[in-house]
Amino acid sequence: AEEMKILFTDDNALYNDIKAKNELLEKYGESCRHNISGKTVKIPVTEAAKSLRNKSEWMMEHIRKTEWVTDGEGNGWFNGYYDNNGRQVEGVIDEQVRMMLTGEVFSIMAGTATEDQIMAITKSADKYLYAKDIGGYRLNTDFHEIKTDLGRMFGFAYGEKENGAVFSHMAVMYANALYKRGFAAEGYKALSSLYNAAMNFEVSRIYPGIPEYFNASGRGLYHYLTGAASWYMLTVITEVFGVRGEAGD
């Protein structure tokens, strides 16, 4: 659509100018607010690819520089959230370390995290999120508050559902991301921790399989709400055993 052409504007000066970016988006919105012209334009595939690649590279570098947080003890990870009041969620907040797994998974998987940053993230996750007896990597540290401006997770006690449980699909995606970036030992730790927890019937109280999550006492819950088993199989086959194509080949 002709209206979309403006979105392919490729200019580093624009990317660094918040006001100019908002003006461009407003102009695009105005052009298609009530109707679409129906006109089309041709953009060379190479030009579109270059524009999208430059946008992604700028964005990733921006995240590396502005969203990296540390605990003052040599550990670091990415802040992945802002609450509904526009406040940074992760880092050391009120002298309390706050870390969430999801932002680390996608920064690693997408290639945003550098190798040095991945090493720091895995070290931090082992320190703040890992709980061997209940399946491995929790979704988040305990915030010690009911933070209603961050979503449904605080509708649960710590260790249940999205609030600090070992959420299987995110733990498997963490493993998958680590394998993709060459951190096989760290990825295997995440996979084996889930497996060992699931097979420990005396604690998990489940038939063999991958539950949606393991709670604070290590019990596995809600197999029927997750697709984590398929992620697990995909990771074992394509990453652990390496049986996969390359970019569709």
Where do the model's predicted regions map?
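Acidic, mature catalytic/reactive cores of soluble proteins
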Residues: A1-D249
